[in-house]
């Protein structure tokens, strides 16, 4: 980009997608926090702070979107398993609707952007037939 003072856009998904992503993953199958941490990273949210993920899970539980229960194992320490509750399913439906609307807008935006780039690339790059003729001596 140029040296202007405009801040360059950040790549990846915004942090506020963490809650929606956690609900999606828990809706697919009950899961432990560590498993969710790995799955979130694989979906493109980038490196997620484990503390932030567990805080989000606790808030979602407090808000009645998920429930948790302890799963005891003879092979290791007890682990908390998270499950989606009906309010979490409603919230997930609402997010899906909002994301569909965002997808529609982004498709329009990117289509228009592609047309600009296409137009500018043909304006700035001379076609081979328009190359200047070599100078000849008289």
Identify the residue ranges that each predicted region occupies:
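Intrinsically disordered, low-complexity serine/threonine- and proline-rich regulatory segments
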Residues: 1-21, 25-28, 78, 95-105
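Basic, amphipathic "hinge/linker" alpha-helix immediately C-terminal to the N-terminal HTH DNA-binding motif
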Residues: 74, 78-96
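Short, solvent-exposed loop/turn elements at beta->coil junctions and helix N-caps
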Residues: 9, 71-72
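Glycine-centered, phosphate/nucleic-acid-interacting loop/turn motifs that mediate DNA/RNA or nucleotide
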Residues: 64
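Short beta-strand "wing" residues that participate in macromolecule-binding interfaces
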Residues: 68
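N-terminal helix-turn-helix DNA-binding core of bacterial DNA-binding proteins
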Residues: 10-54
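Short, hydrophobic-biased segments on the C-terminal half of alpha helices
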Residues: 54-61
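Amphipathic alpha-helical dimerization/coiled-coil segments
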Residues: 90-138
